[in-house]
């Protein structure tokens, strides 16, 4: 059973919040677009007109960041880079997750170019903005051909 305390939904048994997300990490796109490496097993991807996509993605990202901040959500923005080329970098939820006990989990990724998304700037932003007490790094499973994208 859950109860509402102010604007927070609380688990009546544990007294802990059911939803604690007031902060999100977003990657501001630079070269967002179709990813040949992930298209082989991602039904959501459709090849389209590539020319306008990076600019449109940046504009949409900026608008979304502004909307979130206007509604009280703290947005940690990591600027993407041109190199290495990471067309899916706007989806960092696939390579890491944070948990309310201070755990950071790093996940093994299928596509080699998705693994390049674990850029120092993104990892630094996570370390600086979340109280990381423990890290579970599952990325070594990539070497065994095992993948678990968050």
Where are these regions (language model features)?
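The feature marks the mature, well-folded catalytic cores of soluble enzymes
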Residues: 1-150
């Amino acid at each position: 059973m859950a109860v509402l305390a102010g604007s927070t939904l609380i688990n009546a048994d544990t007294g802990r919040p059911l939803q604690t997300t007031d902060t999100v990490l977003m990657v501001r796109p630079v070269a967002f677009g179709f990813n040949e490496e992930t298209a082989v097993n991602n039904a959501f991807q459709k090849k389209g007109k590539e020319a306008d996509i990076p600019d449109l993605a940046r504009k949409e990202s900026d608008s979304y960041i502004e909307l979130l901040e206007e509604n009280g959500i703290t947005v940690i923005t990591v600027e993407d880079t041109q190199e290495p080329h990471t067309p899916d970098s706007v989806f960092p939820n696939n390579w890491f997750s944070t948990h309310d006990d201070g755990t950071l989990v790093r996940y093994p990724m299928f596509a080699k170019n998705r693994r390049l998304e674990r850029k120092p700037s993104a990892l630094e932003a996570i370390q600086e903005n979340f109280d990381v007490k423990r890290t579970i790094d599952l990325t070594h499973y990539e070497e065994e051909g095992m993948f678990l994208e968050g």
